[in-house]
UniProtKB/Swiss-Prot annotation:
It comes from Vibrio cholerae serotype O1 (strain ATCC 39541 / Classical Ogawa 395 / O395). This is Ion-translocating oxidoreductase complex subunit B. Residues 32-90 form the 4Fe-4S domain. [4Fe-4S] cluster 2 binds at residues 114, 117, 120, 154. Residues 25-195 are cytoplasmic. It is found in: Cell inner membrane. The complex is composed of six subunits: RnfA, RnfB, RnfC, RnfD, RnfE and RnfG. [4Fe-4S] cluster 3 binds at residues 124, 144, 147, 150.
Amino acid sequence: MSTIVIAVIALAALAAVFGAILGFASIRFKVEADPIVDQIDAILPQTQCGQCGYPGCRPYAEAIANGDAINKCPPGGQATIEKLADLMGVEVQDSAHDLDNKVKMVAFIHEDMCIGCTKCIQACPVDAIVGGNKAVHTVIKNECTGCDLCVAPCPTDCIEMIPVQTTPESWKWQLNAIPVVNVTDSAPAAQKSAN
């Protein structure tokens, strides 16, 4: 037999042996994940922004499973808090970040100051910044979560957080500001005072 055929057979045999060892090890040493952590992680928005105080959504999901508050995720908003409360069987909590009264902010890059270093692109957890090396970068406003992680790495301080302009889509009615009077409760009192 030729040396090439012997080498191919030897490599194939080694690959089969090591593949079998890896297959056995993956079954034997498999670590079961907590299913509740997986369910919580599926509800979280996966922005990995760190606004909750944890380095990403998975560590925050593990903390929630261990009893931490469910109201620390600004990108998820009130809808995420309600889903987490339903899953965990706890009361719906108000947001820890006062999301209803907080103005949504997005990153804005002053393009005349941008040097194209890509540090902001690397820091953005949701890929809301586009641009290339040594080229001007810009922010996709609809994708930006306002996490503020892109501001610190910028060497020229050309990124600032600006409030999102109010549009018909982002308008929030303050329905609790309108007082509601129950007419049926006030009618007997008015009749008693007339008598």
